[in-house]
């Protein structure tokens, strides 16, 4: 299945400034889904939660547990909104391309935003930048910069390289898992459309892979949030 992303090249007349319309559209859809879901889940709150309120409270406690596993709650509670936003956004982004793919005139429109390395690396870069921001804000510039030459100044180049490797691994791990899943799903869809025998031959593997992809999508959203809090704790906690 040879499909390309709908890309607008050289926007505003700037060479190399390209815009992937599929990523833009799917990111907007994912954000809209997350926003509507969270508003729906937080309306008419009751002392005895039921239905979607139960799930929302479980999600809050789940993310809170991730934070407390990496830093004390007094320091980490300000990261609860960040963790919730990330886990919902990444989960929906991972799963939205599982059900189907949308192709219009050989352009791939409907897909998981996290199946694009540009999107995941941009997200990981933003997260690493946030860790530096909160490290300076909560510890002070002088104390924060000292961490790069601790315990000895020789550690400075290694810690600089570590920042780049953390950014790459955080983004590429998410991209690789979701992209591989969508590629295999696309191959199965292609097999199913070749003939009636191909349809029955691919139907069961396709259903099994879609189920497995839901599991992978959930695991990867957890891993991303967990690593975010690990990196954050390294910057804001004095015991790291």
From Swiss-Prot:
Matches recorded under InterPro entries: ATP_syn_F0_a_bact/chloroplast, ATP_synth_F0_asu, ATP_synth_F0_asu_AS, F0_ATP_A_sf
Top-level division of the source organism's lineage: Bacteria
CDD domains hit by this protein: ATP-synt_Fo_a_6 (cd00310)
Membrane topology of this protein: Multi-pass membrane protein
Gene Ontology CC terms: plasma membrane; proton-transporting ATP synthase complex
Annotated transmembrane regions: 21-41, 78-98, 116-136, 183-203, 212-232
Database matches in PROSITE patterns: ATPASE_A
Main location group: membrane
Gene Ontology molecular functions: proton-transporting ATP synthase activity, rotational mechanism
UniProt-listed GO biological process terms: proton motive force-driven plasma membrane ATP synthesis
This protein's UniProt keywords: ATP synthesis, Cell membrane, CF(0), Hydrogen ion transport, Ion transport, Membrane, Transmembrane, Transmembrane helix, Transport
Keyword S-adenosyl-L-methionine (UniProt): no
Localization, UniProt: Cell membrane
One Pfam match: ATP-synt_A
Entry-linked Gene3D superfamilies: ATP synthase, F0 complex, subunit A
Role description: Key component of the proton channel; it plays a direct role in the translocation of protons across the membrane.
Family: Belongs to the ATPase A chain family.
NCBIfam families noted in UniProt: ATP_synt_6_or_A, PRK05815.1-4
Subunit structure comment from the entry: F-type ATPases have 2 components, CF(1) - the catalytic core - and CF(0) - the membrane proton channel. CF(1) has five subunits: alpha(3), beta(3), gamma(1), delta(1), epsilon(1). CF(0) has three main subunits: a(1), b(2) and c(9-12). The alpha and beta chains form an alternating ring which encloses part of the gamma chain. CF(1) is attached to CF(0) by a central stalk formed by the gamma and epsilon chains, while a peripheral stalk is formed by the delta and b chains.
Record's protein name: ATP synthase subunit a
Organism expressing this protein natively: Oceanobacillus iheyensis (strain DSM 14371 / CIP 107618 / JCM 11309 / KCTC 3954 / HTE831)
Source organism phylogeny: Bacteria, Bacillati, Bacillota, Bacilli, Bacillales
Gene: atpB
